[in-house]
Every structure is written in C-alpha cells, then in structure tokens.
Regions:
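Alpha-amylase-like alpha-glycosidases and glucanotransferases acting on alpha-linked glucans and related
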Residues: 1-113, 138-273
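Conserved, well-ordered alpha-helix/loop/beta-strand core segments that scaffold catalytic motifs
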Residues: 105-138
Length: 273
C-alpha cells in the first residue's frame, strides 16, 4: 500500500529507543489516508467479511471518529443536540455527508487488526502468549458512551450523575477523581450484560489472556458527584458481583481472565475472586 519513500521521507522526530508519540500522532494521518485510499480502491478479499464481523461496533466507531474530526476534536457533549442525542435522521444525514471519512476510519481498523493478528500469530508460534489489559471504565468522550448512553448513569441531558474514582487514603488526602462515567448496572442486568459480553468476546479474539484492571469495582465501586473537584464526597455502591461473570460464562464459557489483586481486599472482593 505504501512505498518506503512515502514514509521514510517523513521526520517522525524519534530517535532509537525514544518515540515522539505527539509527532507520530500528528504526522501519521497523511500516510494513513494514502494507504487507505489504495486499500479502498481495491479492497482485499476478506475486507467485506471484516466489516460484517465487526458490525456491532465498527460503524458507530467510524462515524464517531468522522464527527470528531468534523468538530475539531471537541467532546461529543459539545456537538449539536441532534447529534448528541443520536436522532435517526441526523445520523443518516451525517453518514451520507461523511461517507468518505467513515470509509477511511473503517479501513484504518482493518489495517490495524490485520497487522495485530499477524503479530499475535508470530508471538504464539514462538510460544509467547499476549496478555491484554481491560480497563473497567471507559472515557466520557468515547464512542461507547455516545452510542450506548442507556448503559451508563447519565441524566436526562446525557450528563453523568456520578463518576468513578477512589476515596481518600494514605496516598491522597482528597482521593482520586478519575472522572469516568459509571455503568448503570441495573440496566445492564436487564439485558443480560450484553455490552460486557460483547466487549469480553471481542477482546478474547485478540488476546490470549485478559487482565481486568480495577476488578474490585465489580464487587463495589466508588461514586463521586459529577462536577466535584475532589473525591472526598464520594460513596461506595454495590457492583454487579458474580451475576456479571455468570452471564459471561453462559455466553462465552470460561475465558482466561486475570483479576487485578490490590493486595488489601475486602471480603466482598475476595469472595468474587
């Protein structure tokens, strides 16, 4: 898709042993657009199959990224109200208007997954297994929250009611304010934790083992009022517990999972482990 001179001529501002990720992020798009244009002009034989297999997330992701570009990268909460609320006619118009950008972002994902699976196959052939990290939470400015607001604790204006973090302790007198939207565990339970099942199923396809970060959040999680500047006013709430993993086991069997062990655990977390 690319000739060596098309990427070797670019100053990536990196040195051996040190990658300038800021420069890489800014300068890669010209090269990616060129590669994706050539891919889309003559799609690989498995491209349509890739789109079909990833239809549960890829169209929303590609549209989200296209809209982020169109809005100069601002958070989706600052988009026009019809886009924020995903009104069907507005989304249809956006898909038509930004069709080329959507195609680009889907092609980028195809290239990534093709390269990733090649890397994983090589590692596995050498007797190496890859452990993938699975953060429990997602960012507010994410396609997950924008496309599935019903899965999160948001108010009628799509604003988080409470956010994630940790209480004050010996390391911080004011606690940790992470700011991630919290899951609406009741809503998730009502649909069989489908969002989590999809997430874990997908990640099991690209890693050999999953490590779940902040595993204790499934037993009990700390909720901080949205807008607070510290975590001091938060309170503990009960998580889904084993019900979530029972749903995962029902759909996926017994995926290989590593649960983060913080060392000092409460009884509810220890029981879940």
């Amino acid at each position: 898709l690319l000739q060596p001179e098309e990427y070797e001529s670019i100053d990536w501002e990196s040195t051996p042993g040190c990658v300038n990720y800021g420069a890489l992020y800014q300068k890669r798009y010209a090269v990616l657009h060129k590669a994706c244009a050539r891919l889309l002009a003559a799609p690989p034989a498995d491209y349509a199959d890739f789109l079909a297999k990833n239809a549960f997330w890829l169209p929303d992701y590609a549209l989200f990224m296209a809209l982020k570009d169109a809005h100069n990268g601002v958070c989706w909460q600052q988009w026009e109200e019809p886009l924020r609320r995903r009104e069907p006619e507005t989304l249809a118009a956006a898909r038509a208007k930004y069709a080329a950008d959507i195609d680009f972002w889907q092609a980028v994902q195809y290239l990534f997954y093709a390269q990733w699976h090649d890397l994983k196959a090589y590692a596995n052939a050498q007797g190496i297994e890859i452990i993938g990290d699975l953060p429990i939470y997602v960012a507010e400015d994410s396609v997950d929250v924008w496309s599935c607001p019903q899965e999160f604790q948001l108010d009628e204006n799509l604003v988080p009611t409470e956010v994630a973090g940790c209480p004050p302790d010996g390391f911080s007198a004011t606690g940790q304010l992470w700011g991630n939207p919290l899951f609406d565990w009741d809503a998730m339970a009502a649909n069989g934790y489908a969002w989590w099942v999809r997430r874990i199923r997908h990640l099991c396809g690209i890693y050999d083992v999953l490590r779940i970060d902040h595993f204790r959040g499934f037993a009990g999680y700390y909720a901080i009022p949205y807008g607070d500047k510290t975590a001091e006013n938060g309170r503990w709430r009960t998580g889904p517990g084993y019900a979530l993993f029972a749903a995962v086991k029902k759909e996926l069997g017994s995926p290989r999972i590593i649960a983060e062990d913080l060392g000092f655990l409460t009884d509810d977390v220890r029981a879940l482990l």
